[in-house]
A protein has these predicted regions:
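Long, contiguous binding/interaction regions
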Residues: 1-61, 104-174, 182-188
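Hydrophobic alpha-helical segments with strong N-terminal bias
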Residues: 18-20, 70-72, 98
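Short, compositionally biased low-complexity segments
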Residues: 25-36, 70-78, 195
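Non-transmembrane, aqueous-exposed alpha-helical and coiled segments at domain scale
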Residues: 41, 63-74, 82-84
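Flexible, glycine/charged-enriched surface loops at secondary-structure junctions
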Residues: 70-71, 172-176
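A broadly conserved sequence feature marking short terminus-proximal activation segments
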Residues: 75-126
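Single conserved hydrophobic/aromatic residue that forms the stacking wall/gate
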Residues: 192-201
């Protein structure tokens, strides 16, 4: 059953998240990624949202492999207020920000990802430092900050669009997974056929 959360719960969760970030920075003195989801409305955790979050973590791991990075620390937290993941990395903060923005901008699902990169001194790395545009609105594609501050779109519209994005991403992933399993099955059957001794009549 999906649980709704209050503003007080969200504020408490934000405070705990900041405290966790500060503890990691104090312990490692290295940049970190704080990954959460941009989910509008009172429901912040559901099987569909968790699927989207898991995909985001998978994409981050792929980027780590490409960059030959192994996180010094990786923490994952699941609360009624939403999923959170923290990655401490021994790398240049701007380099990290570049691949997180690549993930955020690559697909519709990425627009629901909030991958903050935090320097050892606690300052966030801004997109502007990489000469990148700000985040775009889910619905109209305009500047997200403008639409949010002016409340251009209703909560219902944002929730509907969010569900659409999460559902499409889940379905696409299921199709891709099924295709990979089919290829593996065919390969397995072909190997069995090749390994079978030839019978002569």
């Amino acid at each position: 059953m999906e649980t709704t959360v209050s503003l007080v719960q969200m504020l408490d969760a934000r405070e705990r998240r900041v405290q966790h970030q500060q503890a990691l920075l104090a312990q490692y003195h290295k940049p970190l990624i704080c990954f959460t989801m941009n989910i509008c409305g009172p429901v912040k955790d559901s099987p569909l949202i968790r699927r989207g979050f898991a995909r985001g973590r998978q994409l981050l791991r792929q980027q780590f492999l490409r960059a030959k990075l192994v996180p010094l620390r990786e923490d994952a937290i699941r609360e009624v207020t939403g999923c959170e993941a923290f990655y401490v990395l021994d790398a240049d903060p701007l380099t990290i920000k570049k691949f997180t923005t690549d993930i955020e901008d690559a697909t519709p699902l990425g627009r629901l990802f909030d991958m903050d990169v935090i320097r050892p001194d606690g300052r966030k790395v801004d997109r502007e430092e990489l000469h990148l545009e700000g985040r775009r609105c889910l619905i109209c594609g305009g500047p997200a900050k403008v639409c949010s501050s002016r409340r251009v779109h209703t909560v219902a519209e944002l929730q509907e669009k969010t569900t659409e994005i999460l559902t499409d991403a889940r379905d696409a992933q299921d199709i891709a997974d099924a295709a990979r399993l089919s290829v593996r099955a065919l390969l397995y059957l072909s190997l069995i056929h090749i390994s079978e001794p030839t019978r002569h009549s």
